[in-house]
Amino acid sequence: MISASRAAAARLVGTTASRSPAAARHQDGWNGLSHEAFRFVSRRDYASEAIKGAVVGIDLGTTNSCVAVMEGKQAKVLENAEGARTTPSVVAFTPDGERLVGMPAKRQAVTNPNNTFYATKRLIGRRYDDPEVQKDTKNVPFKIVRASNGDAWVEAHGKLYSPSQIGAFVLMKMKETAENYLGHTAKNAVITVPAYFNDSQRQATKDAGQISGLNVLRVINEPTAAALAYGLDKSEDKVIAVYDLGGGTFDISILEIQKGVFEVKSTNGDTFLGGEDFDQALLRHIVKEFKRETGVDLTKDNMALQRVREAAEKAKCELSSSVQTDINLPYLTMDASGPKHLNMKLTRAQFEGIVTDLIKRTIAPCQKAMQDAEVSKSDIGEVILVGGMTRMPKVQQTVQDLFGRAPSKAVNPDEAVAIGAAIQGGVLAGDVTDVLLLDVTPLSLGIETLGGVFTKLINRNTTIPTKKSQVFSTAADGQTQVEIKVCQGEREMAGDNKLLGQFTLIGIPPAPRGVPQIEVTFDIDANGIVHVSAKDKGTGREQQIVIQSSGGLSKDDIENMVKNAEKYAEEDRRKKERVEAVNMAEGIIHDTETKMEEFKDQLPADECNKLKEEISKMRELLARKDSETGENIRQAASSLQQASLKLFEMAYKKMASEREGSGSSSTGEQKEDQKEEKQ
């Protein structure tokens, strides 16, 4: 344990905190620098000449994900292979081991609920014992299990997957979407995270990017990205609030936009509040009503529950534009008396009553964010809505009541975050030069000191990147080592906050308590990820770590997952090749049989039989297609095609010569007739 009592004395004798220029400006004002000068000084940290190629912006969402790229000065949202601009963040594993991502995974969820993963972003960077995780285990049909490191992972067909891996599979789909559009490999990316994500969750998201094969240049906050999308082409200076209620998380950020500088003043939120909770509340209501009417409890039937879950989500969306909707699920389940059907009418007012407590949970974070930013609602010039749940009229009314103005609909709530990520990618690549983003750390950072007290070194809403040092001392006589426990949160006692990690500084010369001087330095990079060092000022001995939670993924874990992801990518490529080869072969068989019927009178019988044998062999090959390579199938199909082309060429020539013969004979007959007429 180390003592904080020394810190006050140390400060009296001149120990000071070192800060980044951004942090200093945030706390001390502009220090006489113009916006342009400050932008010029700071941009060295934000752009890099080493970045080659396009930087894709990815909104890795709880429910849906979206990808965008910069085209000139404009960001473009890309359509996936299914033609949609957003992709469901759903991953499924079929009984034969095939992995499905996006809409194909979502479509089969009813028949495969135990092995279809959705909303796993809510588990990312979390421990299995977290109350939120324990709550989730009761609400989802798939298995959430404790990993060997204590983190919450998921299980399918006996295999364990980290939430970072599931996120990586979704990111690979987004990467593929970008590559199909760009026509070349997409390597660099900016990925967004909820503003209120802690360090563990940010690190786990970055791990997901690495597993997917992406070079994650920056992790930025979702509300900040949305503000970039909103303010890129705006010239006026103003303070804006970004209210982001998505599929799994809620964030509120207050920003000041001034001459291309986007400065986050404060942020707050709830990382376990979103559309999934609205769906779950409605699902519970439907299940309760169904049991009251039929006496059947649906909670034991995962397949029926998945149907109800999808119907609840659909009804929720419909009630944003309609005042009433019907929920009809025929043959939902069965008991001794026969099949049971679900038929229910749901009004908007009923739904609002069911979820009113969830909407109210967004109010306190908004009030706290305004308080931290030292602004009143009259100071806020615009309120931007982000996230699918902000389409709900009751949510919009709550926002209007809270901020005293109708919210703006200037951005697409589903696409704004990806657009902002692409813009930040353009800034990092040097393609966008008139924008500077100054974000903040959402939670206070510090260490545990004597008595279990949480001593803050960096307060929440400090502009990042930032660096701060403070001197501590030993708590006992003769102490030769100190354990540094790094925590994140706002509670007074360290045990009530999130333990990010811990390390030990050893080799301190024995001395009376309070004599050794141990300098602890916190450094938060532009991704919001924490680096901590502890140095014995007497010996110069230093210990440094990039904070990883006591769980988290080790370097070896990530490398193994990268290899597995590459293996999956290779399997996907082989599968695609095989499917294309099978389609080609079936097309050639069909064309060959059609032509054989068409030219049957011109084809020699023995040649015709040979061709039929070739077709039979091809069909036998297709019958075992799952064990054949695409190349083998393609070669066999090409061989059949060549054989059929030669035969049909012979038949065509024979038919042509027969036509010529019949044509010349008819011409001769005509000439004879003409001679007879003349005579």
UniProtKB/Swiss-Prot annotation:
PTM annotation (N6-malonyllysine): residues: 206
Modified residues (Phosphothreonine): 87
Biased segments, Basic and acidic residues type: 669-679
Main location: mitochondrion
Chain's gene name: Hspa9
GO cellular component, one term: mitochondrial nucleoid
Protein name (record): Stress-70 protein, mitochondrial
Organism encoding this protein: Rattus norvegicus (Rat)
Family designation: Belongs to the heat shock protein 70 family.
Modified positions (Phosphoserine) in chain numbering: 408
Reactions mediated catalytically: ATP + H2O = ADP + phosphate + H(+)
Domain of life according to the entry: Eukaryota
